[in-house]
Amino acid sequence: METFLYTSESVNEGHPDKLCDQISDAVLDACLEQDPDSKVACETCTKTNMVMVFGEITTKANVDYEKIVRNTCRNIGFVSDDVGLDADNCKVLVNIEQQSPDIAQGVHGHLTKRPEEIGAGDQGHMFGYATDETPELMPLSHVLATKLGARLTEVRKNGTCPWLRPDGKTQVTVEYYNDKGAMVPIRVHTVLISTQHDETVTNDEIAADLKEHVIKPVIPEKYLDEKTIFHLNPSGRFVIGGPHGDAGLTGRKIIIDTYGGWGAHGGGAFSGKDPTKVDRSGAYIVRQAAKSIVANGLARRCLVQVSYAIGVPEPLSVFVDSYGTGKIPDKEILKIVKENFDFRPGMISIHLDLKRGGNGRFLKTAAYGHFGREDPDFTWETVKPLKWEKPQA
């Protein structure tokens, strides 16, 4: 049996780039909560003792940007300079303007267009992916890397591992078998965790705690064997972290946000963008399409691409690839996709209820992945029933 190795990585909520994603989405939530028609393009950057939010926002909402920044940093655990940032004493810079009137008239006609007439907020192409290798219909390498990161945060916040600090990264290598185009995971080959820690803990304690409290609860036993390799804080020291260790920027973790390197990516980031931005809404609807294809048994693995032109509602192209796992030809799957999914941005917004902010809805997406999550707010994870005829044997 010929196998291959494939690797996906993830980062924690305290990673500087992810901190920026979460601040940008917390701003989006606050705008949409008061004004569902808010137009938001919010970027964040951070470095030692400083956070800056900048971009274009047109909204009727009354938003205290500085308060949102400080609350988001505090909730993650950035409460003193030792851990990488002090939420209550860092500098917060705000440089936000209105959306360009040129873009506004072309996309939503200054809010006069009907939903089906709303044009794409920009050009671009987005991909959705699904695979039957996990219950979430997501790649196992990505699922495990993501869950290890989420578990690190959990044991830090619940006090199980009090030596943990907010920043950290995970990476998982899985050995796979290619079953006629479908991916079958056989075992976990390598687990890598690099986590920020305090001054007091030894490397041996770090390794023991990570194995017992992070790896064991997350990675199913059937995937681990005596040959599995563990790299636990391989650099030997990671006390300085967060924005003190590295600068951070919104939109720098787009593969972690999606499929861990599987499928494909059009390059557009998600966080801080309202649903007229097809980078986000387009990627969400094609995930729903790909997931529905696999869940309905049309294929074991599937990639869907959609593309747009600024100001034009209808997509320029839709593409489906079942990697040879389709029960019917890809062109027939494509026909089913076009009949069941409306790719116009205004209609995506309605069908996936994307104008609803508040309740940390988009903030939740900004750490530990936008896809494969069981949460009613992740409306794009709902499987649509698709009618199709099984070919006669």
Curated annotation (Swiss-Prot):
It catalyses: L-methionine + ATP + H2O = S-adenosyl-L-methionine + phosphate + diphosphate. Pfam families: S-AdoMet_synt_C, S-AdoMet_synt_M, S-AdoMet_synt_N. Binds 2 divalent ions per subunit. The metal ions interact primarily with the substrate. Can utilize magnesium, manganese or cobalt (in vitro). Pathway: Amino-acid biosynthesis; S-adenosyl-L-methionine biosynthesis; S-adenosyl-L-methionine from L-methionine: step 1/1. Optimum pH is 8.5-10.5. Thermoalkaliphic enzyme which tolerates conditions from 6 up to pH 10.5. Mg(2+) binds at E9, D17. Keywords: ATP-binding, Cobalt, Cytoplasm, Magnesium, Metal-binding, Nucleotide-binding, One-carbon metabolism, Potassium, Transferase. Its cofactor is Mn(2+); Mg(2+); Co(2+); K(+). GO terms for molecular function: ATP binding; metal ion binding; methionine adenosyltransferase activity. Its EC number is 2.5.1.6. CDD domains: S-AdoMet_synt. GO terms for biological process: one-carbon metabolic process; S-adenosylmethionine biosynthetic process. Increased activity in the presence of 25 percent acetonitrile, methanol or dimethylformamide. ATP binds at H15, D167, G168, K169, S235, G236, R237, F238, D246, R252, K253, A269, K273, K277. This is S-adenosylmethionine synthase.
